[in-house]
């Protein structure tokens, strides 16, 4: 099969796939060598970017996926009436602990958060952002939790190594809080001195 036809087949496979597709899966489905498919994926990615299309080809969670451009998110949201997945502060805390400490038990999560996390962990399991990765080899054999492929997809990561370090995360958090405080003060919100008065 010629290159033009193979590229069209790869594009069709990516379009029809419900999630990321590994290079090996694409090659198998297209009946082609992975070494021939990989450069065509790079070509498609470049073509979509240059053409200014409404979608891009991204590599994440060890696979390739066609996704809408981030700048078109508002219009895509209008199309879908269902609410996007939102995470509570408690869920984000538990998810951060799991992401950075995995594999981790629920008791470890409870200890680090200082409160019972059973409901939060169940919610994260239901959303498929975390998964059970095994059992700890201690009396009682508690379940061990880790992040899932859906976690990587949700946050647009290729792998866990793309997570910011704890130091970077702390700096980003401080910067975000500072910007939020400046915005509130500039918008006529309460300032630190007026709250203390």
From Swiss-Prot:
GO terms for biological process: cell division; chromosome separation; DNA replication. Keywords: Cell cycle, Cell division, Chromosome partition, Cytoplasm. It comes from the Bacteria. Its main location: cytoplasm. Disulfide bonds: none annotated. It is found in: Cytoplasm. InterPro entries: ScpB_csome_segregation, WH-like_DNA-bd_sf, WH_DNA-bd_sf. GO terms for cellular component: cytoplasm. Pfam families: SMC_ScpB. Participates in chromosomal partition during cell division. May act via the formation of a condensin-like complex containing Smc and ScpA that pull DNA away from mid-cell into both cell halves. Belongs to the ScpB family. Homodimer. Homodimerization may be required to stabilize the binding of ScpA to the Smc head domains. Component of a cohesin-like complex composed of ScpA, ScpB and the Smc homodimer, in which ScpA and ScpB bind to the head domain of Smc. The presence of the three proteins is required for the association of the complex with DNA. This is Segregation and condensation protein B. It comes from Syntrophotalea carbinolica (strain DSM 2380 / NBRC 103641 / GraBd1) (Pelobacter carbinolicus). The lineage of its organism: Bacteria, Pseudomonadati, Thermodesulfobacteriota, Desulfuromonadia, Desulfuromonadales.
């Amino acid at each position: 099969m010629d290159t033009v036809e193979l590229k069209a087949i790869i594009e069709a496979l990516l379009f029809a796939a419900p999630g990321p597709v590994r290079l090996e899966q694409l090659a198998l489905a297209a009946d082609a060598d992975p070494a021939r498919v990989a450069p065509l994926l790079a070509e498609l990615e470049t073509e979509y970017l240059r053409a200014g299309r409404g979608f891009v080809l991204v590599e994440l969670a060890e696979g390739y996926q066609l996704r809408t451009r981030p700048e078109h998110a508002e219009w895509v949201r209008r199309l879908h009436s269902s609410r996007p997945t939102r995470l509570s502060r408690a869920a984000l805390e538990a998810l951060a602990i799991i992401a950075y400490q995995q594999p981790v038990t629920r008791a470890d999560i409870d200890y680090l958060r200082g409160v019972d996390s059973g409901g939060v962990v169940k919610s994260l399991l239901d959303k498929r952002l975390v998964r059970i990765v095994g059992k700890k080899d201690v009396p009682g054999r508690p379940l061990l939790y880790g992040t899932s492929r859906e976690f990587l997809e949700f946050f647009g990561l290729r792998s866990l190594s793309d997570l910011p370090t704890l130091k970077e995360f702390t700096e980003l958090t401080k910067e975000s809080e500072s910007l939020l405080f400046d915005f509130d003060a500039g918008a006529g919100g309460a300032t630190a001195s007026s709250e203390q008065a």
